[in-house]
Amino acid sequence: IDVDHADFMDLFAELKIVDFLNHPGYLRVGRQEMLFGSQRLISTLDWANTRRTFDGARAYWHGDKFDADIFITQPVVPQVHNLDAPDSSILFGGVWTTYRPAKGQFIDFYYLNINNDDNVAPGAFNKKHVQVKGTYDTSTFGARIAGDYNNGLLWDFEGMYQFGDWSNQTTAAGAYTTGMGYNFANVLFTPSFWIYYDWASGDQNPGFGQHGTFNQLFPFGHFYFAQIDDFGRQNIRDLNFQANFRLTPWIFTNVQYHILHLDSAKDALYGPQGAGLAPQGGAIERQDKTGKAGTDIGQCLHWLTNFHLSQHQDILIGYAHLFAGEYLKQAPTPGEAHVTPAQARDAELFYVQYSFRW
């Protein structure tokens, strides 16, 4: 996703197929971007050099207060030296509906399904003590409620339940987000403050019984979990506090503090990549299958400031510092038998981004 030469990012045909309640409905076929809700499960991944796209068909109707989308697609995999092509082993589809009871308020209900025909899912151990890799078919039911009341009270809630088949196991997994905040509209710098708790299930006993690791599908991985690009919405618990300030009409700043833990000590710490780039939704960053490394990932501070220079130009500056917890100091990375404290240090991220829109 960091290197991709000249290619077709979007290439589709769109046809008006219906007119309902004075609003048209369309069928779009071809290569296209998709973004729904808070981008926890489906996102264009705007942070990466190559935005995420899908090949397939999507029918949608958007009205005054209600939107409905239905789609069947395959994720496009960036190719450095060849034209990008969809992953023919993955079929991803679903239905996403949104109701807006008032301005700035959203209620979503959705069903998503991902099917991978490749033997990439590590399932349960067989009688020969070999972990069986197989295909997977995962369905997700979810709901989201987000918005504000009179530009003061803020809320953001989302819950997701997953079920299906994972290699030679069945899946029962879930995730939720609870967020409450308040916006001080008439105070200097218009500050707003949030408290969030994010949870995504992990497998309590990997390789045995039921598969319990949540699959984050195709998320905006960078935007969540301290924006340090190390953690995904799988086997994780994140209590975080956020503050936003509008220093001037064109300068916005955000500060975050995160307390991060694994949900299951025996399951892995997963990255933010998404199902199109990692077979399990997120690449395994570290794992202690004994559970002795514990669950303390660490704490992270993050700051960003956006300068909106004009209608077309923005400059974004950000910094994050991860204070490594005991888990990072003790759990090995894939291919390592063990890890020493000297190998696991605090992590930092600093970035400057210029964007031009036309």
What do these predicted ranges mean?
Residues 195, 241-243, 255, 303-305, ...:
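Hydrophobic, well-ordered secondary-structure elements that form the walls
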Residues 212-233, 264-291:
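Flexible internal linker/loop segments at domain or repeat junctions
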Residues 17, 21-27, 41-207, 246, ...:
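Signature for the C-terminal beta-barrel architecture of outer-membrane proteins
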Residues 89-92, 134, 221-246:
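Outer-membrane beta-barrel signature, preferentially recognizing the C-terminal barrel domain
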Residues 30:
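Small/polar (Gly/Ser/Thr/Ala-rich) solvent-exposed segments
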Residues 308-339:
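C-terminal beta-signal and adjacent terminal beta-strands/loops
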Residues 1-9, 14:
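Membrane helical hairpin/interfacial module
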Residues 344-358:
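Outer-membrane beta-barrel "beta-signal"
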